[in-house]
């Protein structure tokens, strides 16, 4: 086989693997060298969602049938000789480009992916002499944890975890200088059981290389289930005497109108400051012929420039032509498709019958490879299974365009662990989620654990937008249930949009209008236009039947969701709307959800990445909707801290749980959460809550579902009731601090969502209703537990108070009607896996019930009852440092207003 064929083979497997992580965890089970086929015979551990829990260990030796098929698919004849070696599967090694401008400082980015999963890996990267790698100029990102200087790798945070976790350090390194033979970077103790697209990303900053070729090498060792070493994988780069880093910068903007048409190209490069005279060349015939578009001199540019007025609908090529000096000659070529590419002109049918998935994925891949651009969907219906999104590609849906899910989405990923110990449930007695402290799959519900079984998926990509005023529908083919993996393989899609460790994601309609609000008479949203209203909502993106998640964004930053109408055409097959797990810098605004079965905006942090990640900086405004759960929720997944969350202008049409909920259960600190502070923009109305089982639900429990956690069964008495339940022994109780809620009008306090019901059924006494609940958490005392309490939590705190909680300017009218005996109700402490309103049973107050709170302000609040209620208006149970001012409760027919315990 020729060298070209070998390179093609490597590229083929690289593309298959990088483009679709879900399809295989073992890549390249064979290699061809000359006339010899090399087969790798070792062991790995790998589970699909169907693999029995004890059957994950498997051989890496490819079967003869599969080998023949792969050779056939690659167009390669079976080589003359065959050899089997006892090696780990080869790794993949990539650089961001093949050529670099010689003698000018540039960054070199290297990506490494081990051929198979393993704990406690050793990874070796060899850099030839001339590529100067140091602990200070090299930055490293291990499995997506975030980039840090190499020198700081041993100190990088491993996230939040319990002391039973095997790996409490991201890794260590050594850098051996072999003089003229280069340097070897040795990464030690790397946990590669998790696959987040790339295992290691290295960025070497400001490197100057000479005009020559350099060969980089990488290899690694496995520890389990069998100690193995891989062969060396090589990649070659070259220093050249020409500009090699001309780059077209992708469009990045957060406003998108119907008239948007990208016709400007922006470029950057590293220029030689001594020889500035350069021309920018343009080609309209795929780089066959060139003409000058700009003459540049030193005063006209600083390593960047724009080209404007390009004709839409054309593919342009650009390059630099340096006229003098050591870099004289033409640079690398960059591409730009001006305007938007009409997908129907490139083989996509959009006829509602033909499966357009493969052609659309090819267009997305091609557009990304050419630097990005916008795909335009004209009127039509486009059936798709899974669209694999790529960096810098935008989708524009015209008003008559419908993207429609069909069966056959990508399967869930292969994983090192089995998830069968826990996929869903709320049991306080089930120890299986904690059985293996390292198994990150069992620390959250199955819907959060897998990412590729989605209608749209992206992993470690950036600058992706799905915009317009068309429609996206799951069409009944996206599953809502927790038992999704019991379905046939082609029916396991449970997410519409799934983004994992991405940056700069936007989904929504056309922007430019003002604030969205709601008209009770028409039961429709409208836009505010100054002091008037605008009932034209045709700018909104329409989404329906989104499955378990319309959006699951995990470890994804700079997210913008806006101007979307959920459920206009169909209201079934929808559960959560927006789930943000461990995301930062998120904006959500102008959202209307006609009805759904779960949270509309939900924030959390889980273990699905194999590590935890903090969540911070949220701006949420103008959210209107009806839900079977909560309109706004923090939790239940709270494996890491969540802070700086600003919510303004919410309108709850119905909620069978809470209008506004904060629930920390897994040890995280939730802090600095504000409702109606005005931080996100204008407070155009008071917030409204109607038909909520409870308006507010703030709670703490110690479920402790985080990697490294340990749980034991205990028997104890509480309120004269025997409880036999799990208690978490090594995870601190979470915190809720600095919460300010104000400016809300609340009425019809009962679970009155129209989910699977009339719109809306009036209160008849059968619906569930609760007080505003604000409750910390206390472990049972030593004397309450049979045999005593056998552990002390890491911070020695066994009662966690909510701290600095403020309610101001709240007007509430409740149903009332409770008898005198309910005033003596003693709600239980929340057990493991219990975090819902109903778990507190009946409360002794009809207005606010506070327990385990330190630092409380209730000011300018009023509570009224439709019927006399024999409970207290406000109960303070184990509350410290409270300030109550200007409160109003009903008169003589009700009991005493306030009770202190």
Indicate where each model-derived feature is located.
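Extracellular/periplasmic carbohydrate-active domains that bind, remodel
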Residues: 16-17, 25, 81-901
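N-terminal targeting signals for Sec/Tat export/insertion, comprising classic cleavable signal peptides
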Residues: 33-68, 77-79, 99-116, 204
């Amino acid at each position: 086989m020729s060298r070209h064929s070998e390179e093609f083979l490597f590229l083929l497997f690289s593309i298959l693997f990088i483009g679709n992580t879900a399809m295989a965890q073992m890549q390249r089970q064979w290699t061809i060298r000359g006339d010899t086929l090399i087969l790798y015979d070792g062991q790995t551990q790998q589970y699909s969602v169907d693999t029995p829990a004890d059957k994950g260990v498997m051989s890496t030796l490819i079967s003869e049938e599969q080998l023949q098929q792969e050779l056939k698919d690659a167009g390669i004849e079976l080589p003359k000789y065959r050899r089997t070696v006892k090696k780990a599967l080869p790794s993949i090694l990539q650089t961001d480009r093949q050529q670099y401008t010689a003698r000018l400082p540039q960054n070199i980015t290297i990506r490494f992916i081990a051929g198979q999963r393993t704990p406690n890996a050793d990874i070796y990267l060899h850099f030839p002499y001339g590529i100067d790698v140091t602990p200070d100029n090299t930055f490293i990102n291990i499995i997506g944890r975030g980039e840090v200087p190499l020198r700081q790798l041993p100190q990088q945070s491993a996230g939040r975890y319990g002391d039973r976790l095997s790996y409490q350090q991201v890794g260590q390194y050594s850098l051996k200088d072999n003089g003229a033979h280069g340097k070897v970077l040795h990464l030690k103790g790397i946990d590669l059981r998790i696959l987040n697209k790339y295992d290691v990303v290295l960025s070497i900053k400001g490197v100057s290389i000479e005009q020559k070729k350099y060969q980089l090498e990488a290899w690694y060792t496995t520890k389990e289930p069998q100690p193995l070493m891989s062969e060396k994988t090589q990649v070659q780069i070259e220093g050249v005497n020409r500009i090699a880093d001309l780059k077209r910068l992708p469009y990045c903007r957060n406003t998108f109108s119907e008239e948007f048409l990208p016709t400007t190209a922006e470029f950057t490069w590293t220029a030689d400051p001594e020889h500035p005279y350069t021309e920018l060349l343009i080609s309209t015939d795929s780089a066959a012929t060139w003409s000058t578009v700009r003459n540049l001199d030193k005063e006209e540019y600083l390593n960047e420039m724009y080209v404007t007025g390009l004709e839409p609908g054309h593919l342009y090529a650009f390059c630099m032509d340096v006229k003098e000096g050591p870099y004289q000659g033409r640079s690398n070529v960059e591409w730009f498709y001006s305007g938007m590419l009409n997908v129907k002109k490139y083989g996509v049918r959009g006829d509602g019958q033909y499966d357009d998935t493969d052609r659309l994925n090819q267009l997305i891949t091609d557009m990304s490879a050419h630097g990005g651009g916008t795909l335009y969907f004209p009127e039509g219906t486009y059936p798709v299974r899974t669209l694999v999104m790529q960096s810098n590609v935008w989708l524009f849906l015209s008003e008559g365009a419908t993207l429609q899910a069909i069966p056959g989405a990508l399967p869930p990923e292969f994983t090192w662990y089995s998830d069968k110990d826990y996929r869903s449930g709320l049991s306080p007695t089930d120890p299986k989620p904690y059985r293996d402290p390292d198994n990150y799959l069992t620390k959250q519900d199955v819907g959060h654990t897998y990412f590729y079984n989605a209608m749209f998926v992206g992993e470690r990509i950036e600058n992706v937008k799905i915009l317009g005023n068309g429609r996206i529908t799951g069409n009944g083919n996206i599953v809502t249930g927790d038992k999704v993996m019991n379905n046939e393989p082609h029916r396991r899609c449970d997410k519409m949009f799934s983004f994992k460790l991405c940056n700069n994601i936007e989904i929504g309609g056309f922007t430019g209008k003002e604030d969205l609000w709601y008209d009770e008479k028409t039961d429709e949203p409208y836009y505010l236009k100054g002091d008037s209203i605008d009932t034209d909502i045709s700018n909104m993106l329409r989404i329906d039947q989104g499955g378990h998640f319309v959006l699951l964004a995990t470890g994804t930053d700079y997210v913008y969701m806006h101007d979307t109408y959920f459920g206009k055409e169909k209201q079934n097959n929808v559960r959560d709307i927006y789930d943000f797990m461990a995301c930062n810098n998120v904006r959500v605004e102008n959202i209307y959800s006609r009805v759904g079965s779960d949270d509309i905006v939900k924030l959390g942090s889980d273990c699905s990445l194999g590590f935890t990640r903090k969540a911070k900086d949220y701006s949420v405004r103008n959210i209107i909707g009806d839900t079977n759960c909560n309109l706004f929720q923090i939790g239940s997944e709270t494996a890491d801290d969540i802070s700086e969350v600003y919510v303004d202008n919410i309108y709850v049409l119905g909620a069978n749980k809470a209008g506004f909920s904060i629930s920390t259960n897994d040890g995280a600190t939730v802090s600095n959460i504000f409702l109606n502070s005005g931080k996100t923009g204008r407070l155009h109305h008071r917030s409204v809550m109607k038909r909520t089982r409870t308006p507010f639900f703030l709670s703490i429990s110690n479920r402790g579902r985080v990697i490294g956690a340990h749980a034991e069964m205990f028997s104890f008495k509480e309120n004269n009731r025997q409880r036999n339940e799990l208690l978490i022994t090594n995870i601190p109780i979470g915190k809720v601090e600095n919460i300010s809620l104000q400016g809300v009008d609340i009425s019809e306090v009962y679970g009155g969502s129209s989910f699977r019901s009339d719109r809306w059924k009036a209160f008849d006494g059968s619906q569930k209703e609760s007080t505003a609940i604000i409750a910390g958490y206390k472990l049972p005392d030593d004397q309450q537990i049979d045999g005593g309490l056998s552990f002390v939590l890491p911070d020695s705190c066994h009662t966690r108070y909510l701290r600095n909680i403020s309610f101001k300017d709240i007007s509430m009218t409740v149903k009332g009607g409770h008898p005198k005996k309910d005033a003596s109700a003693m709600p239980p402490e929340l057990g493991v896996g219990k975090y819902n309103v109903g778990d507190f049973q009946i409360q002794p107050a009809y207005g606010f019930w506070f327990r385990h709170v330190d630092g409380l302000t209730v000011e300018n609040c009023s509570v009224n009852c439709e019927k006399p209620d024999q409970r207290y208006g406000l109960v303070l149970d184990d509350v410290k440092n409270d300030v109550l001012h200007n409160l109003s409760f009903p008169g003589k027919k009700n009991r005493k207003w306030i009770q202190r315990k």
